[in-house]
Amino acid sequence: MAVSWRSWLANEGVKHLCLFIWLSMNVLLFWKTFLLYNQGPEYHYLHQMLGLGLCLSRASASVLNLNCSLILLPMCRTLLAYLRGSQKVPSRRTRRLLDKSRTFHITCGVTICIFSGVHVAAHLVNALNFSVNYSEDFVELNAARYRDEDPRKLLFTTVPGLTGVCMVVVLFLMITASTYAIRVSNYDIFWYTHNLFFVFYMLLTLHVSGGLLKYQTNLDTHPPGCISLNRTSSQNISLPEYFSEHFHEPFPEGFSKPAEFTQHKFVKICMEEPRFQANFPQTWLWISGPLCLYCAERLYRYIRSNKPVTIISVMSHPSDVMEIRMVKENFKARPGQYITLHCPSVSALENHPFTLTMCPTETKATFGVHLKIVGDWTERFRDLLLPPSSQDSEILPFIQSRNYPKLYIDGPFGSPFEESLNYEVSLCVAGGIGVTPFASILNTLLDDWKPYKLRRLYFIWVCRDIQSFRWFADLLCMLHNKFWQENRPDYVNIQLYLSQTDGIQKIIGEKYHALNSRLFIGRPRWKLLFDEIAKYNRGKTVGVFCCGPNSLSKTLHKLSNQNNSYGTRFEYNKESFS
């Protein structure tokens, strides 16, 4: 089916507009800097010595400055959560743009990697040219101490060279540890290496303080390429033949021939030798604002998370899932948000994000998370909270909470699922443990659904193991019964899909009788499901929310952009596992 431009603009329009603006800024900055160092009269002599390497190194540096400043803004998660929840961002389309903060962070990171490669390659050429093209006439312009000096000395004995090598090493560690395989299998490595960005920014501020590249300051008394007759003062000579015979070098573009020569057959002689000065470091102007903002937020988050929570209970669920319920004074959160957990007994520095499956309300202060036991951190954390003999049992006695290790939380932080209650119709699709963001929304509806705009919720949950449905089977049954008792049976449409049939009889029973008729074997037929939703919600805007594997996300994303004959628009929102 053809793409609906109305749906495409709703889902992709603002994102692509922002991408175009960001890309234009990079291209404009690169090209403007390239022309400055290629044609600017103040860099005439430096360009003669270094050539194209000078232009590429400085142009790539300007792009690096821009992206090294922008990459920090998406990481100000407390600020983003505040903007999302405040009335200062009333537009839902603008709030949805905040969901792309992680994608923008990755885009800036990839750009930094690419242009760092260009920058390094250009400076390797510059180091060679500094050595080979050593200038006897303009000694202060040289970075090398003598002609044919080993270029490696410039790399390892100068401040820009040494800090540049260190930054390349740090960046390489951050890149390799950011791959999907390492993030999933060993999150510790990703966490520790990513915090090296503090070292990277310290090296960056030192990197620009070397002063190796210099520009000419006295253009008025020494135009680039002017004739010097070794006299103490300037004079005009009526010998145009002298100019054509002794001065073969053309004037650089952007700097015209002296009017005395072009109009009166006279040429201006140099009044003095050129003077050079190191470029003023500009990197700190780019990064100081975002870096200070980020550091201020980290300080605020440290103060906010400095008090440990009180663990109320710990439960072990099937398929290696653990639930923790806790309380903390003055803690508030909205459905769909997430927090980070920090347990010093497991790791002194690591913080791991988990979606809230239960939010505090006005009547109860308890909140909770569900953890899938994947990786060494969650395994060690489970072993601390649940003794081996109790890992397969139900809720632990409250009296044991005094033996729990100290646990600190940071947050809450915003996520796309906060918008699910702001649509009149929402479609929530979960794959496996991806159900956790929707659990807090279902709990909120169970508590009180009337204050929210939502009037119809389609909840689709796909699992391989039927035991996984037991994580929230009680919640789904209570929600179903609540709306039946309130004569609103069409408020929540629950569909559970099981991709494997082994042990299906284990969930069939009186306790979960309400779910039996909503349990299907196989995978959803997504196209038919979207057509059905569009048919029963003609002309409305349906919010589509997905948390699951990439294959599932791509399918729903594609269907959300397709046209339908009912005038229904699907707005796609996604959360990722990693």
Swiss-Prot record:
Q: Where is this region: Mediates interaction with TLR4?
A: 248-575
Effect ascribed to mutating H47Q: No effect on H2O2 or superoxide generation
State the needed cofactors, names only: heme
Domain (Ferric oxidoreductase) spans 58-303
Membrane-topology descriptor:
Multi-pass membrane protein
Domain FAD-binding FR-type span(s) in chain numbering: 304-419
Q: What induces it?
A: By 7-ketocholesterol (at protein level).
Annotated TM spans: 17-37, 63-83, 104-124, 155-175, 189-209, 425-445
Q: Which EC main class describes this enzyme?
A: oxidoreductase
Q: How is it modified after translation?
A: Deubiquitinated by USP19.
Gene Ontology biological process: bone resorption; cardiac muscle cell differentiation; cell morphogenesis; cellular response to glucose stimulus; defense response; gene expression; heart process; homocysteine metabolic process
In which tissues or organs does this protein occur? Expressed by distal tubular cells in kidney cortex and in endothelial cells (at protein level). Widely expressed. Strongly expressed in kidney and to a lower extent in heart, adipocytes, hepatoma, endothelial cells, skeletal muscle, brain, several brain tumor cell lines and airway epithelial cells.
Q: Which residues lie on this side of the membrane: Extracellular?
A: 38-62, 125-154, 210-424
State where the protein is found. Cytoplasm; Endoplasmic reticulum membrane; Cell membrane; Cell junction, Focal adhesion
Q: Tell me the segments the record calls region E-loop.
A: 218-273
Positions annotated with a glycan in the UniProt record: N133, N230
Gene Ontology CC terms, in alphabetical order: endoplasmic reticulum; endoplasmic reticulum membrane; focal adhesion; membrane; mitochondrion; NADPH oxidase complex; nucleolus; nucleus
Q: Which Gene3D superfamilies match?
A: Nucleotide-binding domain of ferredoxin-NADP reductase (FNR) module (3.40.50.80), Translation factors (2.40.30.10)
- Subunit composition and interactions: Interacts with protein disulfide isomerase. Interacts with, relocalizes and stabilizes CYBA/p22phox. Interacts with TLR4. Interacts with PPP1R15A. Interacts with LRRC8A; this interaction prevents the ubiquitin-mediated degradation of LRRC8A.
PANTHER family the UniProt entry points to: NADPH OXIDASE (PTHR11972), NADPH OXIDASE 4 (PTHR11972:SF206)
Protein name (Swiss-Prot/TrEMBL)? NADPH oxidase 4
Instruction: Give the originating organism.
Output: Homo sapiens
